[in-house]
Amino acid sequence: MMHEMTATLSDGPKTAVSPSFGLRLATLSPLETLAQSVSTIAPSTSPTLTVPLVFALAGDGTCLAYALALGLIVLVGLCVARFARESASPGSLYEYTRGSLPPVLAALTAWALFFAYAMTASSVIGGFLNYAYVFLGGLGPRVPAALLACAVAAVATWVAYRDVKISARLMLWIETISVVLIACVVGLTLVRHGLHLDRAQFDLRHISLGRLRLGGMLAIFSFVGFESATTLGAEAREPLRTIPRAVIGSALLAGAFFLVCSYGEVLGFRGAPTSLATSTAPMRYLAARAGISFAGVIIDAGVLVSMFAATLGCVIAASRVLLLMAHNGLAHGRLQQTHHHNQTPGLASIVAGLAALLPALGLVVRGVGGADIYGWMGTLAVFGFLTAYVLTAAALAAHLRRRGRLGSGTAVLTVSAVVAMMVALAANIYPVPEAPYRYFPYIYLAYLAGAALLCRRGLAKFARV
């Protein structure tokens, strides 16, 4: 049963908690709300998969690349948190733009956000496949990649379908254990090198600014999903207070973790026979150099499970965006139904799980490796996230200006966020990257065009809403 909205964004400075849309009310604690954003970021996966990719581009500037990415994400996070203090809804960034931008742009935000979460889930399924074979090695017969992909997607969808509270607790424990273990290895690596500053990582005379820019754009993928706590809406306790804190807190905590890890990994691989850029298990190598080889195996196991947690977090976020889209005519009406007992978006969870599985499964069948799936799907996801981030920052400026509350500080914030994200988006397009990355912008545009064609009738209804 829906609960009446106490206020809307158009009411001025008042705040609002949206209807529950059949979801459980006030079921998640502040820590569990934070867990949604943290698990979608999946901080333990970046030191093992993303940092080596950033190092391949930025070299010794890897830590600076992460500092650049953190600055951009904080700008967007401040815009999102400002909205989250005024309204809580399972529609996330889509709900924020719906009340402030023209219907077409709000619909664009919705479809971009759903695409971003689904592609991120598909990406980490690829990461799961890659790391499963690294971790399992020669233990027993090799399980077919297609079967592994189906298994991780099916279990994540089932948990999301079953209970969001169980999901949040599970994700919190998984990420906490993984992050603590990685922090221990990085800490021992720093101690082993005498805790002195590695000046080479901050000497701009020997760091290519062009490659630093490219590395910084790739480092953004480590942060995407930090805003996913906003998809919980009224499922969180005191959502107007806990959700903004989760958004900013997850970005800052993850950023600090990434800065330390990227610095420690670059330092730890100096003089190593294998480059960080080509290492398949960097934490296992660093653990061995620190004299605690057993920790490397435990970390690999934790990262593997963290990949599952990230898949789960993305399915949860995508299903709730899809739920509100269905309520507003942007998706099939049956997707707005919630399970009568679990009080979760049952059918939307299944659709989100399938949207995550099918791209990864299609690539696996064609013989594409897990690492490539992680990189390719992650790049596609960035297009969706950057689109949603740009429109959310613009929506905040429009929302406050319409109500005469746009101060100079907020104006500078929103303009800075929009410009920063537009630059990041352009960096993924020009200079024209090599194949297959050069085709990804066209795939994304084709997806948006297809969504618009499918929802022509729904767009008219949405405009009336």
Residue ranges and their predicted role:
Residues 1-61, 73-78, 199, 203, ...:
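Membrane-interface "cap" regions at the ends of multi-pass membrane proteins
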Residues 380, 384-385, 406-465:
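A generic transmembrane alpha-helix motif of multi-pass inner-membrane proteins
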Residues 95-97, 102, 133-138, 246-315, ...:
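TM-loop-TM module centered on a large, flexible mid-protein loop between adjacent transmembrane helices
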Residues 49-56, 65, 74-153, 158-161, ...:
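Hydrophobic transmembrane alpha-helices that form the core helical bundles
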Residues 27-37, 102-115, 148-151, 206-219, ...:
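Select transmembrane alpha-helical segments in multipass membrane proteins
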